[in-house]
From Swiss-Prot:
InterPro entries: ERT1_acuK_gluconeogen_tf (IPR050335), PAS_13 (IPR056751), Zn2-C6_fun-type_DNA-bd_sf (IPR036864), Zn2Cys6_DnaBD (IPR001138). Residues 134-150, 352-366 have a biased composition (Low complexity). Residues 151-218, 264-287, 314-325, 376-408, 537-565 have a biased composition (Polar residues). This is Transcription activator of gluconeogenesis acuK. GO terms for molecular function: DNA-binding transcription factor activity; DNA-binding transcription factor activity, RNA polymerase II-specific; RNA polymerase II transcription regulatory region sequence-specific DNA binding; zinc ion binding. Transcription factor which regulates nonfermentable carbon utilization. Activator of gluconeogenetic genes. It is found in: Nucleus. It holds the Pfam family PAS_13. Belongs to the ERT1/acuK family. The gene is acuK. CDD domains: GAL4. Keywords: Activator, DNA-binding, Gluconeogenesis, Metal-binding, Nucleus, Transcription, Transcription regulation, Zinc. It comes from Aspergillus fumigatus (strain ATCC MYA-4609 / CBS 101355 / FGSC A1100 / Af293) (Neosartorya fumigata). The keyword Zinc applies. It comes from the Eukaryota.
């Protein structure tokens, strides 16, 4: 009895170690019992205690094999592992499958396997590989699978020697994935078809690229494999990802973000972009003779998927009298009208391998406006086939990314240099005289009661103005005016880009900048508001000034006699109080008194009534029957276009609006300008 118990101990120990052994016979058990009894001292050190902290610990494997994973046993990094070798399963030993994370549910299984090279996409289902965009030439590659492996066969396809045997430069990538070969597209399609068909079954075709091309740009071919991390110089080990698929996706997004801001003068190799290749080009289209996809009209500068091809420098090489971009070099037009929309080159997708090049549709991509009305199919067909508009010029490109470039050879824009602001300002602005002019205008137009309300509002902030300006000398005042003009210089671009009626005023209420939409809404011309033309407005919105209800002003905005003699010929802008009715002016100055030295980022949003610009002739026209019928037509048909906006409030001379305004301060914390946005209440 004692012998059987002692003899069973080695068998249990062997089973605990995970090694399958044959059951010993009776003689072996007796022999083991003798050795166990006589040599207990020798076997004692060999029995390892699971709780002994000093025992050697087995190194944890990165990923267990399939058999060890199912048995929940410790595996090793080597393949086949020791346990599978002992069990005779070394031929079927391969990495186990882990449960995918939710964000990797659409990732291919091969992408999640560690230790795989650049070709880790499972392309077993891909038997045909197109070698040209029009699909005329294809190479059928048969995949051979390992019969011994039943889990994840590694497909093998024909690989192509893309580069020469000469050593590559540091800009070239070390390996080329066999998924998408690179070909020299300088050869004709017929030559490519013959060479490929004759050498597919004999030996892999070898196409060479010049050494200059390799040193300039390693991505000189029409196709590339995004599955190769070396193509983009990705250091996957430093990205702190547990799988290569997530690291490659993160690196691709970073690569695209890096190249998104490339300007036409940036080098593709400096930003890691694939946008411009060195010398490899597409051949001329054999059907039409037009430049192929990737060839520019002037210098034949090719492009690839990285940068926008329309942003290359080739428009600079055109004739000086040509004011539009040539689109025929991008999309061949002659005899291939369907190429403009359905077969246009697709955008580059980043999800998987080269098969994703055809995933985005050309109809969903930003299209090119050819400069004709596409509602007429006949005209569209003629324009697309010829590539010319009715006047014989090339169609204009309206892509938003070309906005900054189209201005260079279209209608030349006025060059604006902020240095002119500092050179032109030589004298400080006469704010004191302007406030005196404002006070005189308020006394002439408003009733004594409303004049008192405005005076109280201005008197509440007068001490703050005195305190902030008493330490300023002449140089400070000149610098203050330079700050104002420089800020106004920035707001001019904002006003032109914004479609909301906008005006900018000084702290005295004088108009300093105005948008075109405000002039359309109110009828006030920009030159009149800025004081460059005479102010012939007689509309005061039913003024409550003493005496008659009509205005007591002359043809011009009233000015101070001292200012007229001091600065003759100086432009006299219109005051903000001349644009609003009486109640709106009082409300504005009360809000301005609270906001001028209060919250620096505060704003006021309320309603007001803008006064239309009306001369005496306009006032007489408003009383005629023709204008009455025009107003009835507007009420029935609504407002349409610029003419309809201009007719708002034409009868009573007031346009009810909701407006928002804020106060901007200068470096001395003094209110510098007022920015106001208006929207009519229709």
């Amino acid at each position: 009895m004692k012998t059987e118990v002692n003899g069973s101990a080695p068998a249990l120990a062997g089973d605990h170690g995970g090694v399958d052994q044959d059951t010993p016979d009776a003689g072996d058990r007796t022999e083991q019992a003798k050795h166990k009894t006589n040599g207990a001292t020798e076997n004692a050190p060999k029995s390892a205690n699971a709780k002994d902290p000093s025992r050697p610990r087995r190194k944890k494997a990165r990923r267990a094999c399939f058999a060890c994973q199912r048995a929940h046993l410790t595996c090793g990094d080597e393949r086949p592992c020791q346990r599978c070798i002992k069990r005779g399963l070394q031929d079927a030993c391969h990495d186990g499958v882990r449960k995918k994370a939710k964000y990797l549910h659409d990732a291919p299984d091969g992408a999640l396997m560690p230790g795989v090279g650049g070709n880790f996409y499972n392309n077993a289902m891909r038997n045909n590989m197109p070698l040209s965009r029009n699909g005329t030439t294809t190479v059928n590659t048969t995949t051979q699978q390992n019969s011994g492996s039943n889990y994840y066969p590694t497909p093998q396809s024909n690989s192509y020697n893309v580069y020469q045997d000469t050593p590559l430069t540091q800009n070239s990538f070390p390996s080329q994935s066999p998924v998408s070969p690179t070909f020299n597209m300088k050869t004709t399609p017929t030559a490519r078809s013959n060479s490929l068909s004759s050498s597919v079954n004999q030996q892999p075709p070898s196409t060479t690229v010049s050494g200059a091309t390799q040193s300039q740009n390693p991505f000189a071919g029409p196709f590339f494999d995004p599955s190769d991390p070396a193509l983009f110089n990705f250091d996957l080990s430093s990205m702190n990802f547990e799988n290569r698929y997530g690291a490659l996706e993160f690196g691709m997004l970073g690569h695209m973000a890096t190249g998104a801001g490339d300007s036409p003068t940036d080098s593709a190799t400096q930003r890691g972009s694939i946008g411009r290749s060195g010398s490899t080009q597409y051949s001329t289209t054999p059907l039409t003779g037009a430049p192929g996809f990737g060839e520019s009209p002037g210098n034949q500068q090719p492009f690839l998927f990285g940068n926008d091809p329309l942003l290359n420098e080739w428009p600079n090489s055109q004739a000086p009298n040509q004011g539009h971009l040539n689109v025929s070099g991008v999309y061949p037009q002659g005899g291939m009208m369907h190429m403009a929309k359905s077969d246009a080159p697709h955008a580059f997708a980043i999800e998987s391998g080269p098969a994703s090049f055809s995933s985005p549709s050309a109809t969903t991509s930003p299209h090119i406006n050819s400069g004709h009305d596409e509602s007429s199919l006949s005209n569209a067909a003629v324009n697309k086939s010829t590539g010319l508009t009715a006047n014989g010029q090339r169609p204009a490109i309206t892509t938003p990314s070309l906005k900054h470039q189209s201005l260079q050879f279209g209608v030349k824009r006025r060059q604006r240099n902020p240095s002119t602001v500092y050179e032109s300002v030589k004298e400080p602005y006469a704010y004191t005289n302007r406030f005196h002019n404002l006070t005189a205008f308020i006394q002439r137009r408003f009733s004594p009661q409303k004049t008192l309300q405005i005076a109280k509002a201005l008197a509440s902030i007068r001490p703050s103005f005195i305190a902030t300006t008493k330490t300023l000398n002449r140089d400070d005042l000149i610098f203050m005016e330079k700050c104002f003009q420089r800020t106004l210089w920035e707001y001019e671009d904002f006003i032109n880009a914004c479609g909301t009626p906008t005006i900018v005023c000084r702290r005295t209420g004088e108009i300093a900048a105005v948008g075109k939409e405000f002039s359309i809404l109110t009828g006030w011309k920009k030159d009149v508001l800025l004081g460059k033309e005479p102010n012939l407005n007689v509309n005061t919105g039913g003024s409550s000034a003493p005496g008659s209800g009509n205005t007591s002003r002359g043809s011009f905005t009233p000015r101070s006699s001292t200012l007229e003699t001091a600065t003759p010929g100086r432009p006299q802008p219109v005051f903000l109080a001349e644009l609003l009715d009486d109640d709106s002016v009082v409300e504005f100055y009360e809000d301005f008194a609270r906001l001028a030295f209060g919250d620096s980022r505060g704003s006021v949003m309320t309603t007001c009534k803008l006064l239309k610009y009306k001369t005496k002739e306009d006032m007489e026209l408003a009383q005629s029957d023709d204008n009455q019928r025009w107003n009835n037509h507007l009420r029935k048909g609504g407002i349409a276009g610029e003419a309809g906006m201009n007719q708002l409030g034409f009868k009573d001379g007031k346009v009810e609006c909701a407006y928002c305004w804020t106060v901007k301060r200068d470096v001395f914390d003094i209110p510098m300008l007022i920015v106001m946005n208006f929207l009519p209440c229709i």
